[in-house]
Amino acid sequence: MGLENVPAGKALPDDIYVVIEIPANSDPIKYEVDKESGSLFVDRFMSTAMFYPANYGYVNHTLSSDGDPVDVLVPTPYPLQPGSVIRCRPVGVLKMTDEAGGDAKVVAVPHTKLTKEYDHIKDVNDLPALLKAQIQHFFESYKALEVGKWVKVEGWGDVNEARQEILDSFERAKK
């Protein structure tokens, strides 16, 4: 089964499937799954010496305002393999804009059936303060050395804003 056949989730927006493109703490390489072939491509080598503070991926069958599927960060006890799919629930969203427009990053934790470690996290403010700071710092800085690219972080949104981002992106993709 190709990645294009992975559903958006079991019960949107609270129970989603995230296709992982970049493992947490990996080398500074931006990977993207080609939505037509399902292949994992190297998008670019990041100019900054930074790594993603959580696993990074997307929800299939969604379309964010930047024209890509909704982006999701997933903290886990261990880095996940690119191309793997993880069942999650959203807890918040980092609101930001870049040179291509709105570029929100949903933060989601693994579903309770995978691990009980995140059961106490109901909202982004329940995440460790250091992890939130690392995520924000990463996205404020990761394009700093790339000519013509920029990012403006506008702050954090709660679980309800994350849920709405997922629903809006799912509806946008159906049009």
Swiss-Prot record:
- Looking at the UniProt entry, the stretches that span the membrane are none
Which EC number applies? 3.6.1.1
Binding sites annotated in the UniProt record for Mg(2+) 1: 66, 71, 103
Amino acids binding substrate: 30, 44, 56, 142
The region annotated as signal peptide is none
Required cofactors, per record? Mg(2+)
Q: Does the keyword Coiled coil apply?
A: no
Q: Molecular function terms in GO for this entry?
A: inorganic diphosphate phosphatase activity; magnesium ion binding
User: For Mg(2+) 2, which residues are the binding ones?
Assistant: 71
Q: Its function?
A: Catalyzes the hydrolysis of inorganic pyrophosphate (PPi) forming two phosphate ions.
NCBIfam families, per the entry: PRK01250.1 (NF002317)
Q: How does it assemble?
A: Homohexamer.
Q: Which family does it belong to?
A: Belongs to the PPase family.
Q: What is this protein called?
A: Inorganic pyrophosphatase
The organism named in the record is Haemophilus ducreyi (strain 35000HP / ATCC 700724)
Gene name, per UniProt, is ppa
